[in-house]
Amino acid sequence: MTKIDLLVKNAHVFNVYLRKFEDVNITIKDGKFYWINKELPGIEAAKVIDLQGKYVIPGFVDAHMHIDSSMTTPKVMGQTIGKYGTTTIIADDHEITNVAGVKGLKDFIDEKAPIDIFFGIPSSVPSTNPNMETTGGLIGVKETEELLKDPRFVCLGEVMNFKDMTSDHDTLIKKIIAACRKARPTMPLEGHVPAYHSEDLAKVIYAGITTDHTQQTSSLVDEKIRSGMFVEIQLKSMHQEVIDTVIEHGYFEHVALVTDDSMPDTLLKGHLNLLVKKAIDMGMRPEDAIYISTYTPARHMGLWDRGAIAPGRVADFIVLNNLEDLSIAQVYKNGLPFAAKDEKDNNVYPEELLHSVKAPKLSEADFDLKTDLVQNGKVVANIIQINEVGTFTNHIQKCLEVKDGHVQWKKAGLALMLCQERYGKNEGRYAFALIDRGIVGDGAIGATWAHDHHNLIILGTNIAGMVSVQNLLVEEQGGYIAAKGSQIVANAPLPLGGVVSLEPMSVLGKQISKVRETMVDLGYKNTNEIMSFSTLSLLVSPTLKISDKGIFEVKTQRHIPLFEC
């Protein structure tokens, strides 16, 4: 007689190896699946659960996400997404690393969480180079080799610097890739490969990159898979043509659903389960949608012990009421019911992480946009134009009036953006940009959660409001703030590194939701307003972006002047 801890009977159980449901019984012993079969002779169970025909699938595995990009901690993230069935994540926490380096990263990830968390080694800190952006942390070969010794790190986090990756020179990122290949020859090397195709794509794969998660089209998915890449499909890539391409070509072995950046207010509704449900709604068989959110991501990351309901695998599973709406009845972690909590993070973090915003406060005079190209007349402005979908921008030009050296940007229907160095390295130096299709109403938004350098960014049409937002960001040591007119109406403090909240998700989600509502009221138009604004500073996301060192064209990394004659 074999004694086991739990017997789960009368269930439709998903077999990932056959990609179909079977009417079998499940046994669990010491937190792992033991024997799965119709008949289980000689088994003595301490506890028996009769599911009465419900469906059982493996716990979801999210192979590409960022805990700190959800502005939260590992503990709160685990509390939040565990109840949605996500039991394993691979997190590339390069936000906190850009702020505080390897030490800050270790302080951040050492906290215990109620789900299993593996990590990617942040490869792009900074995302470009110190000549283009100022960061608090730097990751080089030495730091990479240090993290390679830690078994929690199972992949190289997304490599972003296309120019250095494909350069003829022996660049830093090439050295980092070589260090990974030497220490862990089969470790996945995650990429950030937006819109690259043909020879550019070949160059990236030739450099060693195995995976891409960025915004996809059907043709890009097809080309990447045919070229040997594993493609991670996030929400913004879930267009009908992309899903149809995966289905029609049977690309299920080569793709996974991932969340990448989940906003706190979105996490109040769900996590990876929402993408699985969406894939089903778009015509994918439930069995295939489940497969690419459990088994393929686990296999891709070398996590053989999960992503399947089979002997020896970690007993993480989800009980579903039905397959039509993916309604979750119960989640189990290590064979035990997942206990959903919504608690504040009371972990004690180092003081340097709690006091990372060292920028001086600004006044209205600091926001006076001037040019020395002409005293009275016109200048040509290089303008960042926001798109309503995605994080890519357009580079446009407009002629603007100049009076007594002051640029009359408001008359052109533009918004003013400022990016200020906040690590105490350059005395709070700042650069300006002009934004088209940003805020059109009277107000301002600002954040220290500014991908990926996380300097202080402000966008607005009301100078007094911009000053109010900037001053409060400094006082509160970071956050996401919005003002109408000169009055602050929404505030999400992010005191940990200026990028992470310590509040439970129920509180943080509502705070970010209020910021988002204010942005919409001010006329900001994008399918993800928060991410759109916070990636206006992301120097690896096309086309034109800003840092504390100015405006840059992403692909060429060329500095672009704000004004030309």
UniProtKB/Swiss-Prot annotation:
Extent of the signal sequence: none
Record EC number: 3.5.4.2
One family name in Pfam for this protein: Amidohydro_1
Catalytic activity: adenine + H2O + H(+) = hypoxanthine + NH4(+)
Disulfide bonding pattern of the chain: none
Gene3D superfamilies assigned: Metal-dependent hydrolases (3.20.20.140), Urease, subunit C, domain 1 (2.30.40.10)
Cofactors demanded by this protein: Mn(2+)
Family membership noted in the UniProt record: Belongs to the metallo-dependent hydrolases superfamily. Adenine deaminase family.
HAMAP family the UniProt entry points to: Adenine_deamin
Designated name of the protein: Adenine deaminase
Originating organism: Lactobacillus delbrueckii subsp. bulgaricus (strain ATCC 11842 / DSM 20081 / BCRC 10696 / JCM 1002 / NBRC 13953 / NCIMB 11778 / NCTC 12712 / WDCM 00102 / Lb 14)
Gene label: ade
